[in-house]
């Protein structure tokens, strides 16, 4: 078996010394083990005609390219993030479909296939990541590539009622069948994909996870992404920076509810604020004795939907503090800024409650990081949305419906008053799962399964080859 070739929308620079998150950690671990290539967008626009930038370190090579302003707008902003992202997070009301954006999305996937093709070797295995690159295997197949190609979707896959509302849904489904292995975060996501596929064409299934559709054979499997628990525990348990140590001392008699999420409508942040207000309403005995800190750095600030949610959170935070605050006590701290990941792990460790309640999330690694950062002898309690992929694994968390403010409020009260023995027991069960299903286990399982797939024959490629771009009727 040859090299591993990883393809993602963005690549982590080889000289990046910062704390890498989910995808980067898993990809780097896999590439170091197998040797290979990481191919993706540089994050820069302009000078798109210049040659690929290549950097080699040992047995690993990074190859990156620039996008034109038009390609960036149509492929990334207008289709990936204004059509696929909201739809896959069950927000059809926020989808802004435009035909030029769909054509740009298709064009860039074809362009990327053209750029990668000269770099490929016959025995490479190719691992493609996330919703930006749904047509990528199809474009490679058109160019005669019969290598094993796997795909992992980091975000949820919506039900047919949602997915089939997208005008190019049928084309996207057929393109996905050009992958040999399709990986999902949860069983619900895998089944939602198969349900959407079955609504459009005849699907033949052998066993439970080997399928054929449109004359193409592929496998589906569930691979819940993990974290590096040992690394997080080490970051969390180290000495505190002076300002954080001072803050901890000042809050020694206050119970801390802590939450950190990217500012995104899928994270359920307004609902979180309302649930905290319900806690203050229902359980006045906590007044002056708790503090909820929400860190939510700006994401996609140029998009109106994200501007709206930022303004909503600022308004809600001011209203709640104005209603319940006292001299010397501010019940809610909302910080719209970025903090170093290592610092956040230390904050997790001294927090009494981790509040992770997205409305829809593929996995949510923050939930796993909170658990890994805790002191096993005196752990905090995780309150977790039933709609986060992590809820399928972290069953000892307090699982809540984020749309039910009273349900979340009751869970917060229970977390704040939970006896030490129960906290230790729940934490130990979750930590065991996180250690067992860490980031290395995730990537090793996926690559092992991809290697086990039989390569496609030249006859199959010729039969399925399409000469033109997909167009909407």
Swiss-Prot record:
- Source organism of this protein record: Citrobacter koseri (strain ATCC BAA-895 / CDC 4225-83 / SGSC4696)
Q: Which parts of the sequence bind D-glucose 6-phosphate?
A: 10, 76, 130, 300
- Cite the GO molecular-function annotations of the record: alpha,alpha-trehalose-phosphate synthase (UDP-forming) activity
- Record-listed E.C. numbers: 2.4.1.15
Per the entry, what this protein does is: Probably involved in the osmoprotection via the biosynthesis of trehalose. Catalyzes the transfer of glucose from UDP-alpha-D-glucose (UDP-Glc) to D-glucose 6-phosphate (Glc-6-P) to form trehalose-6-phosphate. Acts with retention of the anomeric configuration of the UDP-sugar donor.
Q: Could you say which enzyme class this protein belongs to?
A: transferase
| Entry-linked InterPro entries | Glyco_trans_20, Trehalose_OtsA
Q: In which pathway does it act?
A: Glycan biosynthesis; trehalose biosynthesis
Quaternary assembly: Homotetramer.
According to UniProt, where does the site described as Involved in alpha anomer selectivity lie? 85, 155
Catalytically driven reaction(s) = D-glucose 6-phosphate + UDP-alpha-D-glucose = alpha,alpha-trehalose 6-phosphate + UDP + H(+)
Key word Glycosyltransferase present = yes
| UniProtKB keywords | Glycosyltransferase, Transferase
Q: Which family does it belong to?
A: Belongs to the glycosyltransferase 20 family.
GO biological process annotation, one example: trehalose biosynthetic process
Residue positions binding UDP-alpha-D-glucose:
21-22, 262, 267, 339, 365-369
Name it.
Answer: Trehalose-6-phosphate synthase
């Amino acid at each position: 078996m040859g090299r591993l070739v990883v393809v993602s929308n963005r690549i982590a620079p080889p000289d990046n010394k910062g704390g890498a998150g989910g995808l980067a950690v898993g990809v780097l671990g896999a590439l170091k083990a197998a040797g290979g290539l990481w191919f993706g967008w540089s994050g820069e626009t302009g000078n798109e005609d210049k040659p690929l930038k290549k950097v080699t370190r040992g047995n690993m090579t990074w190859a990156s390219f620039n996008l034109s302003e038009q390609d960036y707008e149509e492929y990334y902003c207008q289709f990936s993030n204004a059509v696929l992202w909201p739809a896959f997070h069950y927000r059809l009301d926020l989808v802004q479909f435009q035909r030029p954006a769909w054509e740009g999305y298709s064009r860039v996937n074809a362009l990327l296939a053209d750029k990668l093709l000269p770099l490929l070797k016959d025995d490479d295995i190719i691992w493609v990541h996330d919703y930006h690159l749904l047509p990528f295997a199809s474009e490679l197949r058109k160019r005669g590539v019969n290598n094993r190609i796997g795909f992992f979707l980091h975000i949820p896959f919506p039900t047919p009622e949602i997915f089939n509302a997208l005008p190019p849904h049928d084309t996207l489904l057929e393109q996905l069948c050009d992958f040999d292995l399709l990986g999902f975060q949860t069983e619900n996501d895998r089944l939602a994909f198969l349900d959407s596929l079955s609504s459009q064409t005849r699907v033949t299934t052998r066993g439970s996870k080997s399928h054929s559709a449109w004359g193409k054979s592929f496998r589906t499997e569930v691979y819940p992404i993990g974290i590096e628990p040992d690394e997080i525990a080490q970051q969390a348990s180290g000495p505190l920076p002076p300002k954080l140590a001072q803050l901890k001392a000042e809050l020694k008699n206050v119970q801390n509810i802590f939450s950190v999420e990217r500012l995104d409508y899928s994270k359920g942040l307004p609902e979180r604020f309302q649930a905290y207000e319900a806690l203050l309403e229902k359980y006045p005995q906590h007044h002056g004795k708790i503090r909820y800190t929400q860190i939510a750095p700006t994401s996609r600030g140029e998009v109106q939907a994200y501007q709206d949610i930022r303004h909503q959170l600022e308004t809600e935070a001011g209203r709640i503090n104005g209603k319940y605050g006292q001299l010397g006590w501010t019940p809610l701290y909302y910080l719209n800024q970025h903090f170093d990941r290592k610092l956040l792990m230390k904050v997790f460790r001294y927090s009494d409650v981790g509040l992770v309640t997205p409305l829809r999330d593929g996995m949510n690694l923050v939930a796993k990081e909170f658990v890994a950062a805790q002191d096993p002898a005196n752990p905090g309690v995780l309150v977790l949305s039933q709609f986060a992929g992590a809820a399928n694994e972290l069953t000892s968390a307090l699982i809540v419906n984020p749309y039910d403010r009273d349900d979340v409020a009751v869970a917060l009260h229970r977390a704040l008053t939970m006896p030490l023995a129960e906290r230790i027991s729940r934490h130990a069960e979750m930590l065991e799962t996180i250690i067992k299903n860490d980031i290395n286990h995730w990537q090793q399982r996926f690559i092992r399964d991809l290697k086990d797939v039989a390569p496609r024959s030249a006859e199959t490629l010729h039969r399925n080859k399409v000469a033109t771009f997909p167009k909407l009727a």
